Each structure stands twice: as structure tokens, then as C-alpha cells.
Amino acid sequence: MAPISSTWSRLIRFVAIETSLVHIGEPIDATMDVGLARREGKTIQAYEIIGSGSALDLSAQVSKNVLTVRELLMPLSREEIKTVRCLGLNYPVHATEANVAVPKFPNLFYKPVTSLIGPDGLITIPSVVQPPKEHQSDYEAELVIVIGKAAKNVSEDEALDYVLGYTAANDISFRKHQLAVSQWSFSKGFGSLLLTIRMAQTHSGNINRFSRDQIFNVKKTISFLSQGTTLEPGSIILTGTPDGVGFVRNPPLYLKDGDEVMTWIGSGIGTLANTVQEEKTCFASGGHE
């Protein structure tokens, strides 16, 4: 199986100032950290990628048409993302700090697609898990694999041939609920909390440094998860967080209203920055104001 080939090396999805429509494009400045530039209010321009408008369109071509970013979106829409698979405890030091045995096999759980928000979105802490300190709202910086073509029963040697690109995520977790049960999907699926940003077609530099200490690296992960089932194009895989999460710190560090959370992965992916907001719930009272 030949590796995926495309005309872009970095891809963003955005609403353009010029058209007020959603486009995909390649940032003109190859060295720009798009997420950080967005946070600093800088102008971001991209060459429009012409095709079906989807990052999954392998025949799409980078044009010379320049567009300016008004709103930065996830690199794939919710409709394009087939499944959100996640690995837990995939770094030995993180497993140790959490006082959990290092897994012998990938520790898989799923998140609902409805938990996805874009890089311009707010991390909303739902009222059901407030106050945050009691429910232990935590952050997890993770490297994300984006699958570009159907993969089933893939060997480790050919696993990278199915990778469209890599992106960053912040897997927001509520530790009180996570540690109360053996299945983590409930505690990691509240509201719109999981964040993705831009894709980079690379597996070198900082991505290697980010993943070198993984128990199950990218090749092992794709091969294992494809056995007996199909990883469809548009599937994303969160590969776990390194050590340093909030709930193991002394004192613990939990997310709260007004916090800014920044996740950085190199190799063209860059910074993911979002603000935390606690959900405000209003109740009607018999028709009187």
C-alpha cells in the first residue's frame, strides 16, 4: 500500500473574510504557529485548496488564490469524523503518576463526536460537573492521528501509509467521574470539550519527540486498532497524554472559569489555545420575571 500523497503539507479549515464561506487551505507563512497567531490577533492568510472542500479529498490541489481567516475551525467537520478513538495511559510516566499499572495492550475508549469543538471555541464546563474543583476538571495534551483511507488488518510496517496527517487535542476530563468507574467515556464526553486545530503531514521533529516515550507508538496503535475492524477515512485517534496533568499535582490544578489552556505540539502543528467557561443554567419560574 502506497503512502497517502497530497499537494499540501499543512492544512487549516476556516471561514474566510472574503467569502464568509468555509474553506480549506495551506497557510502562506510556512513558519507561522497558526493557533498562537490567532490568539495574538495577527492576520492569517492561506492558499485555498481547491476540490470538494474536504481534507479527505486526496485529489484536491493547492491554488494561488489567497484567503484571509475570519474564524478558525477544526480541520475536519463533525460530519466527516467517523469515530473518535482514544488511548489511555499510553505514557509510562503518566501511568506511574496516576498510580496505575502500565497497560500490556492499548487501553481504548471512545468519545462522542458531539464533544468536538474548534480552536476558536470555549471549553464549557457543564453545570452537571460544577463546581469544577469538586468534579476535578482536568486537561490532557495529546497528539492526534487522522486516518486518510480505509485501514483493516494493517501491519505495523504499513501503518503510516494510512495516515492523512497529525493534529493536536486537549482531552478534557473530569477525574471524579473517571475514577469512579472502569469505563471512561462518560467522564470524558461532557458537552463540547475536545479540541482539535490544524493538520500537518509529517512524522518527524517534535512529533517524534512527543511520541517517542509512548508505550504504543503510532505504528503499533494503528495496527492494533485495525485488527478485525475498519478504521474509516476521517477517523481520529488520540494517542494519550504525557505526565504533568492537573489532578496529580500538589496542590491539584483544576480548570475553572476564565482559565486559558494552551497545548503545543511542534512539526507544523503548533499551539491550541482556548478559554474555559462554566456553563450558566437558567430556570423558568412560573412565568414571572
From Swiss-Prot:
Required co-factors: Mg(2+); Mn(2+)
Record: residues binding a divalent metal cation: 140, 142, 171
Catalytic activity: (E)-caffeoylpyruvate + H2O = (E)-caffeate + pyruvate + H(+)
Biotech and industrial use: The availability of a complete eukaryotic luciferin biosynthesis pathway provides several applications in biomedicine and bioengineering.
Keywords, alphabetical: Hydrolase, Magnesium, Metal-binding
Pathway as given in its UniProt record: Secondary metabolite biosynthesis
A family per Pfam: FAA_hydrolase
GO molecular function, one term: metal ion binding
Top-level division of the source organism's lineage: Eukaryota
Keyword Metal-binding assigned: yes
EC numbers for this chain: 3.7.-.-
Family, similarity comment: Belongs to the FAH family.
Oligomeric form and interacting partners: Homodimer.
Cited function: Caffeoylpyruvate hydrolase; part of the gene cluster that mediates the fungal bioluminescence cycle. Involved in the recycling of oxyluciferin, a pyruvic acid adduct of caffeic acid, to caffeic acid. The fungal bioluminescence cycle begins with the hispidin synthetase that catalyzes the formation of hispidin which is further hydroxylated by the hispidin-3-hydroxylase, yielding the fungal luciferin 3-hydroxyhispidin. The luciferase then produces an endoperoxide as a high-energy intermediate with decomposition that yields oxyluciferin (also known as caffeoylpyruvate) and light emission.
Annotated protein name in UniProt: Caffeoylpyruvate hydrolase
